Amino acid sequence: MRLLILLSLFAMNVLSAAEEKIVIWKMDDVRAGEKKRLAQGFKRLAEWAKAEKTVVTMGVICDSLAQPNADDVAWIKANAVENGGEVEFWHHGWDHRSWTDAAGKQQWEFRGPDVATQAKHLRDAQAIFRQTTGLTFRVFGAPFNQADDATIAAMDTVPEITIWMYPPKKETKRKVIGRTLNIEVATGKVSYAKFAQEYAAKKPTSMMLLQGHCGMWNDDSFRDFAKIAALLKQDGWITLTAAQYAEKIGKK
């Protein structure tokens, strides 16, 4: 009987771990340069995270650091999880460009260019972030969430990055975190009503990676974001950074 009880408890613990509800807040487009300063929305979200005793992740566009703003860089350092803050900063490319080539084909920073070009952007961004902040990216998310097979090959040149958000389907070398529900109905516009509708319909029970552009949010969008976060907290969702989540699933 005792053995049966122990086995039952073990099964319950395994089930609990498998069904644990985890949310990752993926915020895009941090800039911290003299030409393109840090948007106030990132500071507001970090302050919210501190008040809520939780964490968020923010992607840095690194060409802005070619001419860094001292105050913005100091803010990154002070708020980084490595320094006791609430923000995981991740690699969001060098220049976040998209364009149409001479043949009329759409190109993105990490979809279209060859391996060498993409590798240079990855390495340059990694190097300048380390140089200006003393921190190292462990997580990558491509601009526009556009990446290709060349990106997969180029990523081998930045071995410090072990986690990829929204990768191509063929990616197998790094831990991957895929897209789930949406909190924005358009870039920079959060809708609690739309999210709540989708959330109720799909009834997610495992990890959710939720993308936003908080640097563009107005007061209404921020309030709707806070309502979404409150809803998930009430429903038992735990907030982690991408690295914390990868570590957690790696132990199972």
Where are these regions (language model features)?
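Sec-dependent N-terminal signal peptides
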Residues: 3-12
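Generic structural signal for well-ordered alpha-helices
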Residues: 42-46, 73-77, 119-126, 152, ...
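C-terminal domain-boundary segment and adjacent tail
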Residues: 162-166, 214-252
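Metal-dependent polysaccharide deacetylase catalytic core of the NodB/CE4 family, i.e.
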Residues: 55-149, 206-210
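Boundary/entry segment of secreted carbohydrate-active catalytic domains
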Residues: 18-44
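Active-site beta-loop-alpha junctions enriched in small/polar residues
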Residues: 28-30, 61-63, 94-96, 145, ...
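Catalytic domains of carbohydrate-active enzymes, especially glycoside hydrolases
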Residues: 41-57
